[in-house]
Amino acid sequence: MILGITGGVGAGKSSVLAILEKEYNAKLILADEVGRELMQPGEANYVNIVNAFGKEILNEDQTIDTKKLAATAFSNPLETLRLNAITHPNVRVRIEWMIKEIRDKEPDALIVIEAALLSEGHLIPLCDDVWYIYTDEQTRIKRIMESRGYSQERCLQTIARQKSDAQFRAECRVVIDNSHSIEETKAQIERHMKKYR
């Protein structure tokens, strides 16, 4: 079974992934990590990103400075679309390869793909089910401020750049409310996991 996990920044996707890994022996595939790997020199997306955004985004050692790339790529929606058009196809190909690797070793493994942009990355067709990890905005702001040291204003800007709650809900069949205690989140996960047995 392949489960897709999505949600906005500060929703607590990591805590849900930790539960799935520990309690259900899930094999995790994190799209952001795959994307970062593919930006390394010699990897599939490196040259195209440098050609698109210029050598100004490079560190002295010729690796991509992700902060400089983010500042450029997220400066306006067209630049974001350009970055996504470069990165998403190869991320999907690498994820398909990772799924095959896992299935070759453990045919019955629970595989979990985590991505904020599951639909934009064309990853939903790979999934048997898709969960949206929901958390109320105030809890998200608190978490982002604690984990990233952002101001409240920067948190709100970050949240505003992402998909809305309604957009996430439209893409997913299951909503996990992660606004409360970890026990409540675990109970919801258990309830939904029972359906797959």
Feature roles, as predicted:
Residues S14:
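Walker A/P-loop
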Residues R36-A109:
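ATP-dependent small-molecule kinase phosphotransfer cores
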Residues I95, I124-P125, E146, Y150-R197:
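Small-molecule kinase domains that catalyze NTP-dependent phosphoryl transfer to phosphate-bearing small molecules
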Residues I5:
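Hydrophobic anchor at the beta1->P-loop junction of P-loop NTPases
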Residues A26-M39:
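Short beta-strand-centered segment that lines the nucleotide-binding/catalytic pocket of NTP-utilizing
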